[in-house]
Amino acid sequence: MLTRVEQDATDREATVLGVDHNWRPTARWNIRSRLLGSRIDQAGDRVQDLGATVWADYEMEDGWRQQWIAMHFGNDLQINDFGYLSRNSTNYLHWEVRKRFTGLPDASRYSSKDWRWRVSSSHNNHGDKLNDQFRMSREGQLRNGSYEYAQINVNSAGLSDMLLRGNGVVRLPANFNTYFEYERPRKGDWAHETELETFTGGLAGNRKLGAGAGYTATYFISDAFSIYAGGYALYTPDWLVWQREDLVGGFKRRQFDLSAGLDWVVDDRHELRVKMQAIALDARVQHAWRFDPQGYALAATDTVEDFSVRNLGFQVRYRYELAPLSYLYVVYARGGYEQRTGTEGVEDLLQDSFRLRDDEQLVVKLSYRFEI
């Protein structure tokens, strides 16, 4: 794929090329490779670079599989003009073993289980180790139609070359995180989703434990009409937030996300959907840090202030089918974002978020299919 994007407002011209290759040398092997290149001209300057990825999957006996992945992204590779790249300057390797269990005893509540074990290593192009990781996960399909997923990541100590935004590196201690998700499909009038997580991180490493918990319930008034509501609470004891230069604040974060909505298929041609999400975040400073050239943290006397964030997104979306594959869309959207110095408490912030009205839009779109 070749793309070219011109942005007159920023005097930017981006050319990105991606070439994919898929090779199956035997029935058991599947090898996928991709070569990427970008050339960016902006304000009279030109940068260009390359990247490559290789995925190799091997099917073994009795449901066992192995996977190898290798990635390299150059320092100046930029593909976000046509896709998404979380970071450049990356060299990544991983090896994964999987086992799928089927044919479980009739007494088992599971119809199948997928276990995965993975080891990986990530470095930047300057030779700095970002981290090594061991991951173990299990995916389960239950006989009643429910779904489970559990995962644990154990991360080695390493460096962050992004936290200071070009002003140096940060040495981070070893940490871990766990995640659990459970989805129960509709049974009677109700469906349920639950999420749980625990984690460590920041400069505290494994000395401080954070946690998150979420729950969403869906009520079916009929097969065509359902409403849902849910929330997610998050506590982070050592949240690192860049301030300026090599100054970082260590915050205690409390956050709550609230979501609600409805889905109504009025008939074969009419559809109405309503979605709302509100976020309240309270961050209270615990430490101020600066970093030496090797990335070691030094206690700073700079003033770092508490802050709070509230955010709202609300949308009403109506769709009418004019003809097969031809639709009329009417969308009303409203929302806002505000960050303040100081703290107010998550409960007050969540209530205040419903008063946000920074943006308000009404969009009408017609999509019509013509036959020639």
Regions found by a protein language model. Give the residues of each.
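Exposed, low-structure sequence patches enriched in small/polar residues
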Residues: 14, 34-372
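Aromatic-lined, polymer-binding surfaces characteristic
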Residues: 1-23, 30
